[in-house]
């Protein structure tokens, strides 16, 4: 975690705006925690963007957990709840909706960064998505 913190600290400049995609899971909460620590030193502006996928009994509880954490730490909280999914591949549709929401929030705040926490499987998914779209891996 020290290496991740140091990387983020070196990456982000004073007074930049960072949108954090936060599910409420351990990876995204660790990212939000680290960015909040950096905020106290570099005076960055943090916006937490949470998507309630509305698919599990605890979805609302997760949303409230993240919302309350942000409130306790004076972080702007933006959320959306997905009410209905189509008949297509659920994971693809959820991902498309989630990143459209993140893009909207980045534009709303004119953010310098959108940050999401990835574990190994997520990272592979990101690499594959970039290859399919013809993007670079940087």
Descriptions of predicted regions:
Residues 1-22, 26-138:
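Core alpha/beta nucleotide-donor-binding catalytic domains of modification enzymes
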